[in-house]
């Protein structure tokens, strides 16, 4: 009988103990899932956040919205520029440049007075040359004698002026060259050369006459040149028997002309301290000869 209550108490204690033991077990089980659930839910929330953040990237609709740039219809609308080019081809009436070819006869017409002006200029130049030649015929005799003196000395001729006379001739020559314009000095040099050649021709002609006079049997007769070398008259007035002295040179006289011209260009400018144009050294043969 005593064992029964003891067993009953043991049963009660066992039941209470089992209940007491069972109660914390479910609490631990509840705590474990609760701890695991937040751990599992956190990455889900983060993934949702990343997914929520990544969602704005696909909606890049504002960038495709500025697709009006490829549409560039406003620029295509600006195609009226080829259309307004019509007025530009329309003002092509400027092409009829008829007024320009029309005034051409006007230019051809005034060419006639230009030719008249050229004739007048040529006449004036001829008149000036004639006046200058007349002046040179009277004034350049001293310069001719200076150059002839240097030529005779270079060739060992006996026809040499005295020193006092030569100094006076030098002074007179320089005075005349100083009065001649610079543009006319080249012509003056050529006239001096021409006068020297004529003088040499005249001297050679006189020598031939003297030789012929020494031959009594010679039937060849020469007329004396008419005032070929008058005193104070400047250049010679050649006779009709000496056509080469009429202001024109023969080709065989070219070396003689060049020699005397070079001598004159070396002597006169340095002696008188005057400027001679450079073209005077290359002027054509006989272009400034007297007529």
Curated annotation (Swiss-Prot):
Residues 32-55, 105-120, 227-237 have a biased composition (Low complexity). SMART domains: AAI. Residues 1-20 form the signal peptide. Keywords: Allergen, Repeat, Seed storage protein, Signal, Storage protein. InterPro entries: Bifun_inhib/LTP/seed_sf, Bifunc_inhib/LTP/seed_store, Glia_glutenin. One of its GO terms (molecular function) is nutrient reservoir activity. The keyword Signal applies. Residues 56-71, 81-104 have a biased composition (Pro residues). It comes from the Eukaryota. The keyword Calcium does not apply. Substrate of transglutaminase. Residues 238-250 have a biased composition (Polar residues). Residues 32-120, 227-250 are annotated as: Disordered. PANTHER family: ALPHA_BETA-GLIADIN MM1, PROLAMIN PPROL 14P. The alpha/beta-gliadins can be divided into 5 homology classes. Sequence divergence between the classes is due to single base substitutions and to duplications or deletions within or near direct repeats. There are more than a 100 copies of the gene for alpha/beta-gliadin per haploid genome. Gliadin is the major seed storage protein in wheat. Belongs to the gliadin/glutenin family. This is Alpha/beta-gliadin A-II.
């Amino acid at each position: 009988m005593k064992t029964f209550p003891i067993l009953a108490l043991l049963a009660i204690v066992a039941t209470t103990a089992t209940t007491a033991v069972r109660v914390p077990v479910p609490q631990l089980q509840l705590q474990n899932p609760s701890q695991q659930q937040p751990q599992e839910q956190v990455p889900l929330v983060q993934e949702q956040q990343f997914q929520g953040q990544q969602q704005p990237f696909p909606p890049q609709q504002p960038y495709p919205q500025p697709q009006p740039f490829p549409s560039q219809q406003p620029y295509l609308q600006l195609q009226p520029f080829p259309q307004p080019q019509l007025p530009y081809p329309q003002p092509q009436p400027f092409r009829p440049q008829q007024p320009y070819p029309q005034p051409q006869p006007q230019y051809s017409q005034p060419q006639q007075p230009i030719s008249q002006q050229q004739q007048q200029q040529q006449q004036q130049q001829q008149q000036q040359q004639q006046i200058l030649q007349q002046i040179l015929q009277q004034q350049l005799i001293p310069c001719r004698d200076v150059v002839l003196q240097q030529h005779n000395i270079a060739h060992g001729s006996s026809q040499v002026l005295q020193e006092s006379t030569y100094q006076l001739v030098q002074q007179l020559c320089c005075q005349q060259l100083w009065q001649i314009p610079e543009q006319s000095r080249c012509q003056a040099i050529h006239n001096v050369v021409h006068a020297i050649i004529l003088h040499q021709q005249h001297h050679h002609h006189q020598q031939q006459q003297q030789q012929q006079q020494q031959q009594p049997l010679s039937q060849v007769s020469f007329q004396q040149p008419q005032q070929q070398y008058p005193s104070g008259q400047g250049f010679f007035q050649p006779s009709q028997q000496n056509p080469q002295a009429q202001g024109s040179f023969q080709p065989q006289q070219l070396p003689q002309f060049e020699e005397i011209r070079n001598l004159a260009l070396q002597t006169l400018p340095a002696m008188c301290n005057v400027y001679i144009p450079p073209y005077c050294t290359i002027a054509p043969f006989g272009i400034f000869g007297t007529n």
